[in-house]
């Protein structure tokens, strides 16, 4: 039980994060692991969506040329990140449907009036093989990181039982992904195929 008015939340507020050299040296996992997944092929002047199928839905990439957005609610807190097709913008949607990356039954809708701000997350770095972006200095990067952290809901930041911060797909992005999966499996969208995808 709690003694002297201490409980789990009280204690965790006093914990320090990242003590010792094991954090600094990335002990146990010194290499940055990553996987390259092709999501589009260049055909003449346009990008054609592509993907590799997997038996595990979480390993199937989101196809095509995409845009990433952060949605802030009326409290000025980040409520979700959203992946859209290249030609979509949440600012043009009266209702924003947030689809789960893999689960068809999981989705939620946000009215545009409930969104205070839509922030584009991508920046153009290279254009026609040339650098077109001026990289910020370390202090500017730190300031942006701090501002982003401040705009997270406290429930996402807490150490015990944190809320999950969602990254979702627009309805159009979800439909594109499902259509491509179905065509690669030789099935009709929305129906199960007896053919198993290659991993």
Segments predicted by a language model, with ranges:
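Gly/Ser/Thr/Ala-enriched C-terminal appendages of enzymes
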Residues: 2-199
């Amino acid at each position: 039980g709690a003694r002297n008015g201490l409980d789990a939340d009280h204690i965790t507020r006093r914990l320090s994060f990242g003590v010792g050299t094991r954090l600094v040296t990335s002990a146990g996992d010194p290499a940055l692991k990553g996987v390259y997944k092709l999501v589009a092929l260049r055909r003449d002047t346009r990008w054609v969506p592509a993907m590799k199928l997997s038996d595990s839905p979480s390993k199937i990439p989101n196809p095509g040329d995409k845009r990433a957005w952060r949605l802030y609610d009326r409290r000025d807190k980040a409520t979700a990140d959203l992946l859209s097709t290249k030609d979509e913008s949440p600012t043009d949607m009266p209702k924003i449907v947030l689809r789960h990356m893999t689960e068809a039954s999981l989705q939620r809708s946000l009215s545009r009036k409930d969104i205070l701000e839509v922030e584009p997350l991508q920046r153009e770095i290279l254009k026609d093989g040339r650098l077109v972006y001026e990289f910020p200095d370390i202090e500017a990067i730190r300031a942006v990181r701090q501002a982003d952290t401040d705009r997270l809901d406290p429930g996402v930041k807490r150490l015990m039982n944190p809320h999950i911060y969602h990254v979702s797909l627009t309805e159009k992005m979800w439909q594109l992904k499902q259509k491509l999966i179905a065509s690669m499996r030789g099935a009709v969208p929305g129906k199960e195929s007896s053919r198993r995808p290659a991993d």
